[in-house]
């Protein structure tokens, strides 16, 4: 039997800097900070870790849309993805619903935009794929010329 290749997994770190604040480092060398609101013992100096999950979804699907629309030869001039969410009342207070709002600018075909959103949410966005089995994800699209 042939040896199986060894997979090296990327390492991410979260280093406590006091209070409820952490500096996170990615495997690609980038850093960001998280904190919690004052009522949770933090100083509210940065997004919470849970907010980063929702922000990650916005970024992931946004990257997909920009790429897919470029491939469809759609003249995208602007894109903003925002999220609102609901959380469970009891701990661990996970997301129960996320609603994405896509605001796009350009002379775009609405049918192609909806197709790009569907491809992102159903096929390409890994964050969406991880959340969707447990979280209701809905969306709306606004296109401005």
Regions found by a protein language model. Name each.
Residues 1-55, 66-145:
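Extended beta-strand/beta-hairpin segments
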Residues 60-61:
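Alpha-helical metal-binding/catalytic segments enriched in His/Glu/Asp
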């Amino acid at each position: 039997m042939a040896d199986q290749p060894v997979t090296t997994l990327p390492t991410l770190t979260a280093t406590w800097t006091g209070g409820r604040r952490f500096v996170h480092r990615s495997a690609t060398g980038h850093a960001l900070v998280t904190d919690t609101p004052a009522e949770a013992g933090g100083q509210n100096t940065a997004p919470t870790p849970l907010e980063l999950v929702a922000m990650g979804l916005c970024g992931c699907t946004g990257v997909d849309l920009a790429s897919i629309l470029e491939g469809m030869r759609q003249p995208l001039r602007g894109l903003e993805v925002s999220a609102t969410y609901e959380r469970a009342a009891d701990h661990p207070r996970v997301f129960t619903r996320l609603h994405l709002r896509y605001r796009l600018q350009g002379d775009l075909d609405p049918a192609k935009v909806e197709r790009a959103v569907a491809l992102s949410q159903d096929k390409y966005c890994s964050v969406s794929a991880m959340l969707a089995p447990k979280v209701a994800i809905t969306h709306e699209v606004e296109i401005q010329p």
